[in-house]
Each structure stands twice: as C-alpha cells, then as structure tokens.
C-alpha cells in the first residue's frame, strides 16, 4: 500500500472539520469593518448566506456594534468591551447581559482623576452598558464620533456623576502623539492596580478594562455554554489583541491587512478588510 505523506493526511483531516464549523468569532475594526468603519453590503450578504452562527468579539461597546449586528442579522451571543460583557439582543432591541466584568467604582474615580490631572491633553471617556461619557469635546472625541457615528453624553460634574455609577466597563484614552502615548501607558502601569488590564488598540487608543475582561475568556464562556469543541470553531482577526482568540479556535483566519507576525499563526490568510475578507474567507475556507 502506498504511504500517504503526513502533511496530506493532516490537510485532509482539517478539511473534514472545516465542513462542520458551528460558530465563527469575528473581530470588528480592521477585520469585519472596512476603512469607513462599515460592513459593506456585499460582505454582509456573503456572511449571512453561509448560514454559520457568528459572534462579534470587540473592544467596542454594544451601541457601537449595533449597526454590524443589524447588518448581519445576528440574534445570538456577542462579546463587547474585550470580553467585559457577553450579551445578546432582546426582542425589543435591548442589550441583555449574560456575563459582566465591570471596573470597581473607586478604581474608576482614581483613574479618571489621575489621568485628567497628569494628562489634560489626552481625550478621556468611559462607558457603561448603554452610554458613552466624556467631560469635554476634543479632537479624540470627534475622531471617535466620526468612526462609530455615536454621540457621547457630556458630564458637567464628574465627581457627582460617578457617585451614582457602579457599572463602568471601559475607560478609553485617545492621543495622536506617540510620546504622549508612551508616557500615559507608563503612568498607568506605575499605579500598579491589580484588577485592571491596560491594552493599546491601534496607534491612537489606550483602553482600560477589568482584569478578567479578555476576548479569550468571552470565547471560552461561549464554548462551554454551547459545548463546542475547538475543531468546530473559526475566527477572523487582524491585530495583536486578536491573538488569544485566534489561538483558541480550530480554524484561525487572518486578514491580508494584518501584521506579518499575526499572519504567521494563521491557517489561511483571507483578503483585506476593504475587500470583504471575512465573507470571502467564510465562503472559500469554511464551507
């Protein structure tokens, strides 16, 4: 009997479980969304027509994910705030939390006061379940508004406001100055707050969430609840914060616009986010 080369056998085994993908996890910015911050009609059609359940996994708030959820007609579980919130959309379009990881109120107050005192030029805002808050309108807030098409709630007396808040999921800072970004990150690390995670997103964003708010933990929760094996899952991503997600699934697919070190862990590299890469990848690699 002719011996079949091992790499061919492995490839054939992978193709077997590609035909049985039961859930896809998908990053948004740089992955699902194009450079205009939108899901193109053609991409949405390709994804919907595949008929495979999709979970969006994002650092965004639910309100910033809504347009994509609607475009893909998603009714299942979604992951927001880098895993700080697992939720689904109710019959009346309300956000129904399934699992939450919020930042402690005293920590939120300490962070906001410290950042504003030492870095007054940095754009600073924060999120609860349904709202985006800021204390001034600046370049960063305008940039985020143009990207997400959301409008923040302006807070006049932040101390008084925070006394009544206990459900902050994310603190977000935006700066377009690289030196300022490095100094800000160094300052936040020096606070040595054990219950938070500080993550850089792209060139201009620094985001703070609960220590347990991680994309990988959100995915692990869904895998347990739905009793899915690794081989039954796929994921699409482009950034370093997507690596844990990509490593958790059987079929990690990376965008053409990703960095080379992200591409190195991919089973397949799909087209870029401006070329309907997610829809193309599903139709060509997962069906």
Language-model features: locations:
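Short, Lys/Arg-enriched N-terminal segments with co-localized hydrophobic residues
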Residues: 6-18
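Mg2+-dependent phosphoryl-transfer enzymes with acidic/Ser/Thr/Gly-rich catalytic loops
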Residues: 19-20, 39-40, 207-287
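Asp-based phosphoryl-transfer active-site loop
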Residues: 20-35
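Conserved beta-strand/loop elements of the cytosolic catalytic core of P-type E1-E2 ATPases, chiefly
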Residues: 33, 102, 209-213
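Active-site phosphate-binding/coordination module
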Residues: 38-141
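Short, structured coil segments at secondary-structure junctions
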Residues: 50, 72-74, 82, 191-194, ...
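Conserved acidic, metal-coordinating active-site core of Asp-based
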Residues: 121-236, 257
């Amino acid at each position: 009997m002719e011996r079949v080369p091992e790499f061919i056998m492995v490839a054939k085994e992978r193709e077997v479980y590609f035909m049985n993908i039961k859930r896809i996890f998908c990053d948004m910015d740089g992955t699902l969304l194009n450079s205009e911050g939108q899901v193109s009609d053609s991409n949405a059609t390709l994804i919907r027509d595949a008929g495979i359940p999709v979970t969006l996994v994002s650092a965004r708030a639910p309100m910033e994910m809504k347009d994509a959820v609607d475009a893909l007609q998603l009714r299942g579980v979604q992951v927001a705030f880098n895993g700080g919130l697992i939720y689904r959309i109710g019959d009346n379009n309300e956000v129904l939390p399934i699992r939450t990881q919020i930042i402690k109120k005293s920590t939120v107050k300490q962070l906001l006061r410290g950042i504003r005192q030492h870095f007054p030029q940095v754009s600073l805002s924060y999120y609860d379940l349904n709202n985006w808050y800021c204390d001034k309108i600046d370049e960063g807030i305008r940039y985020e508004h143009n990207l997400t098409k959301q409008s923040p709630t302006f807070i006049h007396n932040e101390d008084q406001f925070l006394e009544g808040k206990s459900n902050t999921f994310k603190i977000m800072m935006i700066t377009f100055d690289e030196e300022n970004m490095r100094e800000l990150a160094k300052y936040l690390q020096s606070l040595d707050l054990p219950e938070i995670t500080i993550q850089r997103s792209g060139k201009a964003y620094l985001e703070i969430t609960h220590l347990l708010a991680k994309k990988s933990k959100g995915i692990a929760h869904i895998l347990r609840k739905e009793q899915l094996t690794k081989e039954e899952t796929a994921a699409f991503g482009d950034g370093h914060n997507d690596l844990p997600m990509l490593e958790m699934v059987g079929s990690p697919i990376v965008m053409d616009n990703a960095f080379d070190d992200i591409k190195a862990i991919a089973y397949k590299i799909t087209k870029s986010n401006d070329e309907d890469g997610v829809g193309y990848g599903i139709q060509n690699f997962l069906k």
